Structure formats: C-alpha cells, structure tokens
C-alpha cells in the first residue's frame, strides 16, 4: 500500500540555489555513478527515458532507480516524480544535467528523467548506489528507501 505524503510539507523547504523539487544534495561522484549505472543498464538490462515513461514505470511498480535532471525548465515537468517515488518507495537520485542524462540513456537529445527497470550487469553497483543515496537522504532528514529487487 502506498503512503500518502502532503505535497505542501514535502516541498516546503527547498534547498538554496536548487529547483523546488530537489529534496537532497547529490555529490557529483554519486550523480556520475548513477549515470554510469543507467548506461550499463541500457546495454545489458532495461531502461525507460522521458518523464512520461518514467512516471508509468514508477506507478506500475517496475522502477528500480529513477534519475531526475536538476536543470529541467519548466521544473513542473518533473516536480511530481520525487513525491511519487516517495509514495511508491522507489529510490531516486538527481543528476545535474538533462543533456548528460539523455546521453547516458542513449539518445541524442536531453532527457528530463529516466528509470532503470532491470539493472543487468549493474545490479551490484545499483544496490551500492541506493545505499549511498540513503546515507545522503538521512543527512537531509529523509527516510531510507530500500533497494527494489
């Protein structure tokens, strides 16, 4: 059963200098690792790219990791994803650039969001990354989201 979260409280205290939907600061090495895992999963597993496909994968319970770009304009395009991931208990991470996200997803255009559905050869790395994300989330007062198998 999904947990209902009040959007007014969820988005009440945005990080300074970040879009309102960014709930925690992601170090560049963690963001790069997430992009690397997405790229490996694209080649050996299964991914979806774009906000609509990402939303559907989360709602259907297929998502293992959601990647959300921080430089999306307008931000409302992806603003629902962190809240949806929290409700469905899906790990998510922010990456600094939609261009890098698109490239890691194997497309020649920017992508606002992408999702790992099957990690393929990156399964072990994905688990380690989710644990690292949970450490970061704890520093920002957010609960851990377990690795999805």
Curated annotation (Swiss-Prot):
Keyword Signal among UniProt keywords: no
BP terms from Gene Ontology: ribosome biogenesis; translation; tRNA 5'-leader removal
Superkingdom, natural source: Archaea
Keyword list, A-Z: Cytoplasm, Ribonucleoprotein, Ribosomal protein, RNA-binding, rRNA-binding, tRNA processing
Function: Multifunctional RNA-binding protein that recognizes the K-turn motif in ribosomal RNA, the RNA component of RNase P, box H/ACA, box C/D and box C'/D' sRNAs.
Family (UniProt): Belongs to the eukaryotic ribosomal protein eL8 family.
Protein name listed in UniProt: Large ribosomal subunit protein eL8
Gene source species: Pyrobaculum calidifontis (strain DSM 21063 / JCM 11548 / VA1)
Lineage per the UniProt record: Archaea, Thermoproteota, Thermoprotei, Thermoproteales, Thermoproteaceae
């Amino acid at each position: 059963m999904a947990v209902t979260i009040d959007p007014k409280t969820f988005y009440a205290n945005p990080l300074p200098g970040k879009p309102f939907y960014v709930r925690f600061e992601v170090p560049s090495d963690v963001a790069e690792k997430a992009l690397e895992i997405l790229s490996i999963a694209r080649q050996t597993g299964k991914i979806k790219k774009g906000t609509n496909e990402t939303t559907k994968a989360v709602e259907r319970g297929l998502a293992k990791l959601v990647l959300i770009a921080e430089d999306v304009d307008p931000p409302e395009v992806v603003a629902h994803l962190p809240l949806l991931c929290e409700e469905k208990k899906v790990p998510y991470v922010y990456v600094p650039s939609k261009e890098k996200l698109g490239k890691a997803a194997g497309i020649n255009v920017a992508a606002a969001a992408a999702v790992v559905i099957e990690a393929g050869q990156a399964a072990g790395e994905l688990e380690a990354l989710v644990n690292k994300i949970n450490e970061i989330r704890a520093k920002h007062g957010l609960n851990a989201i377990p690795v999805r198998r």
